[in-house]
Amino acid sequence: MSLEMDLIEWALNLRAAGGGVFGSGSEELDRVLKLHYRVTYHAFDRGTKRSVWEVLLAEAEKIDSSKGMELEQAVMGNVFGILYRQLGDETECARWLAKLGALRALRGEYPEFWALLLLENVCYREAIGVEDQQQVFRDVARLPKETHTLTWFYLERFLARVQCERWQAVKEFGGVPLAYLLEAVREEEGVDQWLLEQGRAILSRTRFPAASEKNSTMLEEFHAVLNYYLRKNNKPRSTEWEGFITDSLGVTFQSVNVSKAALTYYRRFGDTKLALLNLLNFFNYSERFRRMNNGFYDDIVSLLDAYTFVLQLTSLPEAIGDIFNKAKAFEQLRNILQEFYRDYRLQQIPKEHSADWLSNSAKVVVPPKLARLLSDSWFLLYRIERNSLKPTLDFSLTYYLANAMCINPLNIDVKFHYAYVLASIRRIDMCIRFLKTNILNIKPADYRSWHLLALCESIQEDKDVSFKIVCSVLKAMAEAHEESNLLKADKWQFIHIKLTQLVLVKEMFGVKDALEMLSEVYQLYASLFPASKVNKTKDESRLGPAHNQTKEYLFQAIWFFSARLFLQDGDAQNAREAIDEAKRVTDTFTNLNVNITHGYLKLHCDPKGAMSEFQNALSFDPTNVDAVVGLAKLLYPEDQGSLERIARHRPIIGTATPKPESDPFANSKDRSAAVAQLKMLLENCIEKSIDGYHTPEVWWYLSRIYDEFHDNERLESALWQCIKFHELEPIRDFKYCMF
């Protein structure tokens, strides 16, 4: 095949995938394909005005396709047909669409692109006759590659219009792949068993290929149908498909389609290990094709879809022997995604510009199914790295989310996570502008975004703006609760916004005023989460399977919050009772906050006991910021005045703690060992913990240690970090708006 032909086929492949940037080697063909892209771009947008279609028609009329290749004539026939349909001229629409019939010779030269043109053509016809239907079933001999998402878009629309009695598709159109796909798309009662019978019939006629033979085309195509059917929705599927897939593996050699159906089946039915093993088979077979075909995957979107679908599992093991490695799998996903964007010439926001969406935003329009996949892939990469410090600081997280927004700009969840990351990296002004412009203007009832906005505004010395936001949101949420319009996560948000209100009251009016409002929190909790006899495993108030996603954990958080307020008021007795109440909430799990809050309670009266509590918490969670800072306060109790001037304490730390009545260290050697341990813990926090890195107290105590060690260079750096993060510290951690 000549280079020119390669370039043309690749340009057609790009168009079938929904791409809009070409390089066929023919200026005229590129111009035609670009116009086709623009027409479908606006066709996907239901709000396109008539004037836009008129402009596009004028541009189309400037192209004299009658003198061009048949390929250009075929594309332009569809372009004019679509334009006249959008302008309401059915006569001209039908005239132009009819031209494709005279160009059927293209099917032999460009079968995959012909499938796109034919399906698009029939979808824009006012009516699809029996002969038209039969032509499609004859001409589209194989299911499109998943990469050809524009072809799939039209194929699904076409199948939705096919007139055929149930189970009669094979009889009426022959035993072709589209006939089986039609029944899978319709999914009428009994289709599971019908498809299983059809698949077994095909399997019974199949034998393992000889060395010079290929796998059975019909069995390969049926497994492509099966993969579509298994992925179509979450309805129950027969477990007998497992045997069918296993038998198919026995009569095929390194089949991409069979391995894809296998990984889909096991992913659907919860066998993580087998899903992962089949994913690796699928990847290896795809890589084999790539090595033999100039470095290009045969169906890169299918591969991207497989990785995204399987790696979304929450129970992924870190490794399965030497066969599977989680980190490597996500690196492969990242590489496949990048390769797709590069080869298919889709616009990306570079990492270095990703934190400034308002200045660098872009809109990437592709067929809906591809848009969902790309958005899911970007968001999955974000989800797996969002708790890691390095990708947070190097803008990897904003990079993933910004590109997810480019492809799916209406997804509020992605937008909120983007705003949350901006806040986490202390791009506060950008976060505030983004929240107001891109979320709250569009969805005014997004309570988590209001909470995040209030926390961002709380950084200002004047807390009035933050306080007004919180009070307004609490009122709106109370009204929504009365009307039973609060979602599960909203109820958790409601509690934490109320706690934020109390912290603001404490800052603005004093701890006594906050304590007077404490009873309102308990009343709110009782209203949102009334006592019930429902089995806890089925508790509808749970956010997820983890202990910190239960309402008991939330109730404990309220008691710990109360204990901290009492500590800040110097009321040790009530603080102790609040901790005891937290312990009594549940015995199904252990909450480290019991140890940490006890540690702060004992800082003055029982420093050795406080040391034990903090050490116990750190043995389970070495980067727990509150425990590390508590340990530091035992080592540097005289720093309280200085620290108060440099960094506002977190709610748990509160006001300055008096110097302990007794020294928790037996001698100077004992203290030196504790300082060495504290140094390791603090440095671990700033190297691994997002919370720790942005906590001014962590940097302050590091500066004290560097001063003690006469490390002037790191001392100065730590002090600057302490001051910077003090100036950007919210009234409560941003994590309290993320559920």
Curated annotation (Swiss-Prot):
Keyword ATP-binding appears in the UniProt entry: no
GO cellular component: plasma membrane
InterPro entries for this protein: Endocytosis_PI4K-reg_protein, TPR-like_helical_dom_sf
Principal subcellular localisation of the protein: cytoplasm
Keyword annotations from UniProtKB, A to Z: Cell membrane, Endocytosis, Membrane
Membrane topology: Peripheral membrane protein
GO annotation, biological process: endocytosis
Compartments, as annotated in UniProt: Cytoplasmic granule; Cell membrane
Matching SUPFAM superfamilies: TPR-like
Role: Involved in endocytosis.
Family stated for the protein in its record: Belongs to the YPP1 family.
Name the UniProt record assigns to this protein: Cargo-transport protein YPP1
Source species: Eremothecium gossypii (strain ATCC 10895 / CBS 109.51 / FGSC 9923 / NRRL Y-1056)
Lineage: Eukaryota, Fungi, Dikarya, Ascomycota, Saccharomycotina
